[in-house]
């Protein structure tokens, strides 16, 4: 385990140059007995494995190994509060666009401080940006590159004075 501030990824890696990163955002909640319980960890890890498969990442991490990584990082950070975990797999090589290995794994666990809009009404704007299509860049996988779509829509909405953006498919639905 490397401290967050010491973790590095080369600027010419596939992860940085091409957005070849997949991840899961996972929540852990502090129970009445003072123990953290990770919400639907097996499901998150299976989706991460699916994302890596679709992105053709060459790796053989089992759900058991990934569970151990998450557990070890939570313990190392000595967290005793609701926690956000970000487990990422990324192309580490400085190779070309088609690089599928080596793959590195990063896991960050930090206290969860929601800035949720649940306690107030949100003002939303239908964006001029369209939701990406599954046949182009599958939004069902959590690939960092896919988030540029929502990022552009959010920037537009906030610039225009709204809290959130609503993205419609190309068909307008």
Language-model segments: which ranges?
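Helix-start/capping segments and mature chain N-termini
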Residues: 1-61, 65-72, 76, 96-173
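ATP-grasp fold ATP-binding core
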Residues: 82-89
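Short, internal active-site loops enriched in acidic
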Residues: 90-95
